[in-house]
């Protein structure tokens, strides 16, 4: 009888968005009979309504499969599902740390994409055994030979044992399972050593508290044990231990090498950090597990409730989301224009959109968001360095020596006929050309250094539209560089509106200011007085538009007449003015705050 550990395989699936990762997971679950026919729905592991709707995987999930291999042994396969989108790289790296191997899924018609490559490099850092799987070979335009050659040339993997599969028709699924058993090594761990377990995810259950998803490296864990978190030394008693099928199923205990979950009455999310190491309180391990780094948010924006009495609800909702999402940060802030709200930090634009949608959908909140910002470094004349995530906090121009902005290294893969369009786009966005490499006769990999601020507006949309949807993008943060940046204020009726301030590059300031005031003129409703809208840098106004006044002579049709009649009309007019939601004296609709995002950034 082989040892328990030798029958365990922990693996994940790496793929670019839409290469069929979740469908492949469905087929593996179906083939091994982990779920009954009734429970099988498409994309079983994408349990969030939003994930199913957008067809993307956001949260990492896990499931335990039982597979009787051709060698007669029954193996336990732990599949840890990972997201493919660039914003969720931290989810991927945590899932990889819990595995010994990975299926590298590549679409037979699309070939290697930018994020496939990024995730492969992550997997190689974790020394994972990679099994190439060419998926979607049932498509009429599939070119498996070309894709296999790409995998060999670009990634340098031997594809002689690559598997051709179709997750849709179920072809090649058994070969995939056999390859997992044969080629992925079993976990190495010692049940006798003190407990060491990696938390790779968590979610909050209103009855049980925080449920931590863990991969045991050494030792064992059972209900009733006292455990300790190694980052903050907090102690808890385990109340429940279980595995994923993919629904949570309690078991008697977990041993080294296994993947499962624990509940320990943890009420505060901060005590259960993803990436932390759990150990036993009586017999603690000396060293925590390596490889966890605190994720830093890259994009910030303000979230404000439309009704000010929802402020507490918004705080509760953010606290709950943070339980599931280690990378979300938030702190309270106030704005003259919008009242009380929160400054939230996200990994990228998709992450921001999803959090916002979850707040509105799952918690029924009505929100106003301000324009997204990146974190700027401001070096003051006295040598002090400030990190600014909100343009309103920028010190006066006289105190600033220079401003530095974050840059990313962007890798763009694109068919050769669109290379010109994409290079134009990168130049418009102040990109610095680094490299261009032909992956095959008709696919090119471009590398640019770009300011992050230029990517977070609509770079991705533009990239897709200029390449007819064929380009794919991956980016990583490379550091700060000085730039000619200025703060642009928007004044409405002479009052600066803090929520509309943006930090822009000097060359684009006039153009952006011009566009923004024109857009605001369309969006701000006409009032009974003239409203000037100005864009200003410091005290210099660079663009101005005026919202014309509505006709206000309510007494014009009275021609003499009784004074009470005139009074009635004047009173009525007064009532109307009261009804306006005021900022200073002007009602600014929510669309106006979003206008900052929608400006065409191309000139």
UniProtKB/Swiss-Prot annotation:
It catalyses: GTP + H2O = GDP + phosphate + H(+). Keywords: Cell membrane, GTP-binding, Hydrolase, Membrane, Nucleotide-binding, Protein biosynthesis. CDD domains: EF4_II, EF4_III, LepA, lepA_C. SUPFAM superfamilies: EF-G C-terminal domain-like (SSF54980), P-loop containing nucleoside triphosphate hydrolases (SSF52540), Translation proteins (SSF50447). It is a peripheral membrane protein. One of its GO terms (cellular component) is plasma membrane. Pfam families: EFG_C (PF00679), GTP_EFTU (PF00009), GTP_EFTU_D2 (PF03144), LepA_C (PF06421). SMART domains: EFG_C. Its EC number is 3.6.5.n1. Residues 6-188 form the tr-type G domain. It is found in: Cell membrane. Required for accurate and efficient protein synthesis under certain stress conditions. May act as a fidelity factor of the translation reaction, by catalyzing a one-codon backward translocation of tRNAs on improperly translocated ribosomes. Back-translocation proceeds from a post-translocation (POST) complex to a pre-translocation (PRE) complex, thus giving elongation factor G a second chance to translocate the tRNAs correctly. Binds to ribosomes in a GTP-dependent manner. PANTHER family: TRANSLATION FACTOR GUF1 HOMOLOG, CHLOROPLASTIC, TRANSLATION FACTOR GUF1-RELATED. This is Elongation factor 4. The lineage of its organism: Bacteria, Bacillati, Bacillota, Clostridia, Thermoanaerobacterales. The gene is lepA.
